[in-house]
Curated annotation (Swiss-Prot):
It comes from Clostridium botulinum (strain Alaska E43 / Type E3). Its EC number is 7.1.2.2. GO terms for molecular function: ATP binding; ATP hydrolysis activity; proton-transporting ATP synthase activity, rotational mechanism. GO terms for cellular component: plasma membrane; proton-transporting ATP synthase complex. ATP binds at G152, G153, A154, G155, V156, G157, K158, T159. This is ATP synthase subunit beta.
Length: 463
């Protein structure tokens, strides 16, 4: 049975005002359906204006919308399909498939606005999550069921790192992933979809996209669509990986919507509700006694300024941060993870073990010392250093290069097969470099290899 019917009275871009009878106003966050002949437009109620008008934000383009059109209150929030049927498929913010592979016959449909799990349902048993990427596993390990921020400016490799993580998790752990593209390039989304089909990880992944060209309403809500699909798997006892690329675009879309709704902007022009909106999303990403959601969120840093309110608000929710640095890109080292800026709450001897903690600390110390010596080297040259400092510089440069790694998803561009390196192998490799076992090998032998044994082989081929 159709719900209450109203009339469109004003359309300003993606903002649509609809008049209902004053005794039958739709609730906030209800989905409103407007039949436009060739298609149905869905809008979400954001404000009640006066006694009988609701202000809504359209989830699709409003071209062709006219005043006087009928608008039907669906009497529920935007709801999306969940369950095994969503795996291997590509969706938009409304949970409609956009991969031309037919309808999705899901057993259940969940609303995208849901409460966060209660405290008594949440589980906090810190446990390390192996990614197979050396620099991450050693220096800023991820927590199972934690939130990880991937920070970096434009073009430093955030999306490639996310693709490699999806690949490693599916192949090594057999885990399910939900990838949410929030306000990013459609071309990248298309490439990701086809690459995942070719590599065979698509069957373990659901993809949800609200890309750059879509209205702000879609970009603001698409993260919730992906999260809702992930929550279902978690509640059924699965360990799920939720990728959000890019969480900054979620904030950006919220800022656009806030301005369109006439709210007075806050610091740097962001919405006054920035912390609340971010909290509502992040509090739902958590582990329960049934299963876990581990989320990896790419965070675009405007003008590389980490004090900007958008990345700064995101920081407060994270368990680990992986910072990608342009200065490391300039050295030709990929993944361009900054070993000194990246951090993790679980890099603790009680959680990762004494050996792991000690090796990670020594690696950071030697890189710090190398950083201090670089000024002296720039002015006086390496020859003026003491023998002890020369050994530090030599080992630090090897460590720096050993932090690089060839990725499976980059194979077609680099021609190098990707490498998955276990935590045990990673710790062993760095420990031996620090002990001076490979002092006689050239530093180029450590660039783009997996385990440390490969450096010996590479050195022979370079000789």
């Amino acid at each position: 049975m159709p719900g209450k019917i109203g009339k469109v009275v004003q359309v300003i871009g993606p903002v649509v005002d609809i008049k209902f009878d004053s005794d039958s106003l739709p609730n906030l966050y209800n989905a409103i359906s407007i039949d436009m002949g060739e298609r149905t437009l869905i809008a979400e109620v954001e404000q009640h204006v006066g006694d009988d008008i609701v202000r809504t934000i359209a989830m699709e383009a409003t071209e062709g919308l006219k005043r006087g059109m009928d608008a039907v209150d669906t009497e529920k929030a935007i709801s999306v399909p969940v369950g095994d049927k969503v795996l291997g498929r590509l969706f938009n913010v409304l949970g409609k498939p956009i991969d031309n592979a037919g309808e999705v016959e899901a057993e259940e449909i969940y609303p995208i606005h849901r409460p966060a799990p209660s405290f008594k349902d949440q589980a906090v048993e810190p446990e390390m999550f192996e990614t197979g990427i050396k620099v991450i596993d050693l220096l800023a390990p991820y927590q199972r069921g934690g939130k990880i921020g991937l920070f970096g400016g434009a073009g430093v490799g955030k999306t490639v790192l996310i693709q490699e993580l999806i690949n490693n998790i599916a192949k090594e752990h057999g885990g399910l992933s939900v990838f949410t593209g929030v306000g990013e390039r459609s071309r990248e989304g298309n490439d990701l979809y086809h690459e995942m089909r070719e590599s065979g990880v698509i069957d373990k992944t659901a993809l949800v996209f609200g890309q750059m060209n879509e209205p702000p309403g879609a970009r603001m809500r698409v993260a919730l669509t992906g999260l809702t699909m992930a929550e279902y798997f978690r509640d059924k006892g699965q360990d799920v990986l939720l990728f959000i690329d890019n969480i900054f675009r979620f904030t950006q879309a919220g800022s656009e919507v806030s301005a369109l709704l006439g709210r007075i902007p806050s610091a740097v022009g962001y919405q006054p509700t920035l912390a609340t909106e971010m909290g509502a999303l992040q509090e739902r990403i958590t582990s329960t006694k049934n299963g876990s959601i581990t989320s990896v969120q790419a965070v675009y840093v405007p003008a590389d300024d980490l004090t900007d309110p958008a990345p700064a608000t995101t920081f407060s929710h994270l368990d680990a941060t992986t910072v990608l640095s342009r200065s490391i890109v300039e050295l030709g080292i990929y993944p361009a993870v900054d070993p000194l800026e990246s951090s993790s709450r679980i890099l603790d001897p009680r959680l990762v073990g004494e050996e792991h903690y000690n090796v990670a600390t020594k690696v950071k110390n030697i890189l710090e010392r190398y950083k201090e010596l670089q000024d002296i080297i720039a002015i006086l040259g390496v020859d003026e250093l003491s023998d002890e400092d020369k050994a530090v510089v030599s080992r630090a440069r090897k460590v720096q290069r050993f932090l690089s790694q060839p990725f499976t998803v980059g194979e077609q561009f680099t021609g190098m097969p990707g490498k998955y390196v276990s935590v045990k192998e990673t710790i062993k490799g760095f420990k031996e470099i620090l002990e001076g076992k490979y002092d006689d090998l050239p530093e180029s032998a450590f660039l783009f290899i997996g385990s440390v044994e490969e450096a010996v082989q590479k050195a022979k081929s370079l000789a």
